[in-house]
């Protein structure tokens, strides 16, 4: 199921490593690698900006997605667009909390751009902020499309990085899944600051 592009789908499971750098000025806040350590994506987040926008770039700095938080929403609504665009015509999906009040176990709904009524989600995410893990499901079903777990290492604690391991199931768009993980991490950081 290609959400971003068929180029980001494989007929076999994909294992990704995601590292969130706590303090960085140059190379982005996230690095996403394959099992061999090859860089696939990175995320640029403006260091000093009033814009709540992140850009998912490929290994060659080509913009793949723009992730924009809608600050006027009560449901932590995020809008995700193709490339560097924020035009409605380039909207790929909207992510929002299933309900306004959620403690420690968030439930998020994802609506693809063609799902204008947003009554039944196209994907949903359940997770545990304590365990820093989540599962992405297709629609309102129990069909898993991806899973994420936080990896704790002594090195990651000492050098200010958070490491995540992600399994993306066959034929699922891994750029889409990476964008969800970036948004989930941001929501988690905002919740822990409140």
From Swiss-Prot:
Q: What's this protein's name?
A: Protein LURP-one-related 10
Q: Which domain of life is it from?
A: Eukaryota
- Record organism: Arabidopsis thaliana (Mouse-ear cress)
Concerning InterPro entries, the annotation shows: LOR, LOR_sf, Tubby-like_C
Q: Which family does it belong to?
A: Belongs to the LOR family.
The UniProt function text for this chain reads: Might be related to the phospholipid scramblase and tubby-like superfamily of membrane tethered transcription factors.
